[in-house]
């Protein structure tokens, strides 16, 4: 193999690498890309999308809510869900697990389950 052929092969490989890395970013997730949420991800999404939306004033004053501080406490979240019925109301005949775990859902669709 001559030097010019070797140089051409290396240049072609480098060009292919640059093209692949620049065009490969088209399939990255955005904030509202639909995704599957199951198990603790449903709880975390509820806390992030639903509770934070209602408590923005408290966060602006630098106070975190007690429920947010005890994020791992599923029993308080269950009590809150029973109190306001957020997870018990069927939406289009489906629950949040059916809608967001078995099928992907966006953040906007998930917010429909906020109380």
Curated annotation (Swiss-Prot):
4-hydroxyproline PTM positions: 34, 104
The keyword Signal appears for this protein: yes
Modified sites of kind Cysteine amide: 114
Intracellular or extracellular location(s): Secreted
One GO CC term on file: extracellular region
Residue positions where 4-carboxyglutamate is found in the record: 41, 98, 109
One Pfam match: Insulin
Residues that make up the propeptide removed upon maturation: 25-29, 53-94
Key words, A-Z: Amidation, Carbohydrate metabolism, Cleavage on pair of basic residues, Disulfide bond, Gamma-carboxyglutamic acid, Glucose metabolism, Hormone, Hydroxylation, Secreted, Signal, Toxin
Subunit structure: Heterodimer of A and B chains; disulfide-linked.
Function: This venom insulin, from a fish-hunting cone snail, facilitates prey capture by rapidly inducing hypoglycemic shock. It is one of the smallest known insulin found in nature and lacks the C-terminal segment of the B chain that, in human insulin, mediates engagement of the insulin receptor (INSR) and assembly of the hormone's hexameric storage form. Despite lacking this segment, it both binds and activates human insulin receptor (long isoform (HIR-B)) with a high potency (EC(50)=16.28 nM).
Protein's UniProt name: Con-Ins G1a
Organism field: Conus geographus (Geography cone)
Phylogenetic placement of the source organism: Eukaryota, Metazoa, Spiralia, Lophotrochozoa, Mollusca
């Amino acid at each position: 193999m001559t030097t010019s052929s070797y140089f051409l092969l290396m240049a072609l490989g480098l060009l292919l690498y640059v093209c692949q890395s620049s065009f490969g970013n088209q399939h990255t997730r955005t904030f509202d890309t639909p995704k599957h949420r199951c198990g603790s991800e449903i709880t975390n999404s509820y806390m992030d999308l639903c509770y934070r939306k209602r408590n923005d004033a408290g966060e602006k004053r630098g106070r975190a809510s007690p429920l947010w501080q005890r994020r791992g406490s599923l029993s308080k979240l269950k009590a809150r869900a029973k109190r306001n019925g957020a997870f018990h109301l069927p939406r289009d005949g489906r629950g949040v697990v059916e809608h967001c775990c078995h099928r992907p859902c966006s953040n906007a669709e998930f917010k429909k389950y906020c109380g």
